[in-house]
């Protein structure tokens, strides 16, 4: 389940999947099946990503930050258990970052770059991009990362005090812009 709705929707979603013990019938690859779901385990998005990081398994608290298109969803795990009361959603997704980058490039250079071009630069893939535009993209991405880290801290999750796992498409794009030099305890992307 999405981080911010995990605590609120967990029981309803479990009930939906269990279907009051009723049999569920379906066809798969031409074969008929009838099953009864007896047990359901639910976890927040990104939970498996934390558990696969052996360096984090003994950490008492870990921040999970899922950077999506429109929002950044946050949750803290305490002793590997999701703490639903710490869920937050920040309206700082990658679309806002890319819009700001595009606006700065238009103002400074009069160029109209696509989101795909900007994403390519953020990943370190683009080769045929105006060098001044590349510098603006890098500078704006750094500014976005600092704004994001500040917002995470303001929401009560201090990235300087506990490790943070960054997930989602936005995390992949910003991988080159986040490091321990940003004051992070231990970033995992």
Predicted regions, residues:
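Active-site-proximal alpha-helical scaffolds that flank and shape metal-associated catalytic sites
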Residues: 65-69
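Short beta-strand scaffold segments in enzyme catalytic cores
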Residues: 72-76
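Short, basic interhelical loop/turn and adjoining N-cap
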Residues: 109-113
């Amino acid at each position: 389940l999405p981080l911010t709705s995990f605590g609120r929707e967990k029981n309803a979603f479990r009930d939906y999947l269990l279907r009051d013990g009723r049999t569920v019938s379906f066809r798969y690859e031409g074969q008929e099946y009838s099953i009864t779901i007896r047990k359901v385990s639910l976890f927040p998005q990104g939970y498996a990503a934390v558990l696969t990081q052996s360096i984090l398994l003994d950490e008492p608290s870990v921040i999970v930050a899922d950077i999506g298109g429109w929002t950044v969803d946050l949750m803290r795990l305490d002793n590997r258990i999701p703490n639903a009361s710490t869920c937050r959603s920040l309206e700082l997704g990658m679309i806002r970052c890319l819009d700001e980058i595009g606006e700065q490039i238009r103002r400074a250079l009069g160029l109209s770059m696509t989101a795909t071009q900007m994403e390519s630069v953020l990943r370190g893939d683009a080769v045929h991009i105006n060098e001044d535009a590349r510098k603006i993209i890098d500078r704006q991405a750094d500014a976005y990362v600092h704004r994001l880290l500040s917002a995470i801290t303001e929401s009560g999750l201090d990235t300087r005090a506990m490790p943070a796992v960054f997930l989602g498409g936005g995390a992949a794009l910003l991988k080159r812009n986040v490091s321990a030099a940003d004051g992070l305890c231990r970033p995992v992307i």
